Amino acid sequence: MVMGHGLGANREMGLDRYARRFAAAGMAVLVFDYRHFGASQGTPRQLLSIGRQREDWHAAIAFARTLRGIDATRIALWGTSFGGGHVLSVAPDDAYIAAVVAQVPFTSGLSSALAKGPISTIKVATIAAVDLLLGPIRRKPIGIRLAGRKRAAALMSAPDVPEGFRRLTDESETYEPKVAARVAFSALFDAPGRRAKALKMPVLYALCDDDSVAPVKSALRAAERTKHAVVKRYPAGHFDIYFDEVFEKTVYDQTEFLVSVLRP
C-alpha cells in the first residue's frame, strides 16, 4: 500500500492512523511526503506542483517494488483529497496497480472553484497572478493560505475548513500554513476525474455527502465512469473522515475492500 496526503499536507497529518490499521490487516504500508513538503527535500519549500507530485507517486511506487518481500503486482494506491485526485490520475499509467482508494478525492478544479464561490476565487486568482509574475523575479514564491473561512483568500475556503483542517495540522510538527500561490491556476484546470474511464483496477471511492472542498457530485461522476468502482458515502464533511466515528467506519470499509482485492 502506497499512501499520500492532500493539498499542502504531510504524512504526519492523520495518515498514521490509517497505516496502522492497514498494517494490522497484513499489508505492508509506505507513506511518503511530496517533495518541498514535510520530511522530504526540495527547494523552495512549500512549492506545490501537480506534475511533480504525480512524479513523486510514480517514484514511491517504483521504490515500493524494490523492497524485499513485496509482490510488485499487488500494490494498491491510497490518496486523500488532492492526493485522491493524484491516484486517479497516476493509476492508469501503471498496468500492475492492483487497487485504488480515492478518499474525498479532488476530481475537478472547476467544480471546487464553483463550490468556493466567486469572491474567494477572485481573491485567490489575484494572489496567484502576482506569484506567477513576481515570484521568479524575487526568487521566492508568494504564499497563499491553505485554509480559510468562506470568501477568504485561501485555497480551501468554507465555514468548516478552519477548524477541520486545524485538527489535522495540530498533529504535524512540520506543517506550514501557506503554499506558493501559483498552483491555483494549474489546479483550476486540473480534472483527475476525466481519467476515470482509464482505470481498469477496482477503485473504492470514499465520499462525504457534506464535502465543502471536493464536491461529491463531481466525484460521483468520476465513479460512474470507473469500470470497477465501489462507492461508499458518509453523512459527513471533508475533514470529518479523518476522525472519530467517521474514521472508524471508513477505515473498516477500506480495509475490507483492500483485503478482498489484494488477498493472494
Predicted ranges, named:
Residues 19-41:
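Conserved alpha/beta-hydrolase
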Residues 229-264:
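Catalytic active-site module of serine/aspartate enzymes centered on a nucleophile-bearing elbow/loop
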Residues 199, 205-207, 211:
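Short beta-strand/loop motif that positions the catalytic acidic residue
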Residues 7-20, 34, 217:
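The serine-hydrolase catalytic nucleophile loop
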Residues 88-168:
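Alpha/beta-hydrolase-fold enzymes
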Residues 212-218:
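Conserved alpha/beta-hydrolase "acid-adjacent" motif
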Residues 11-14, 37-72, 76, 243-250:
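Catalytic nucleophile-loop/oxyanion-hole region of alpha/beta-hydrolase
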Residues 1-6:
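Short beta-strand element of the alpha/beta-hydrolase
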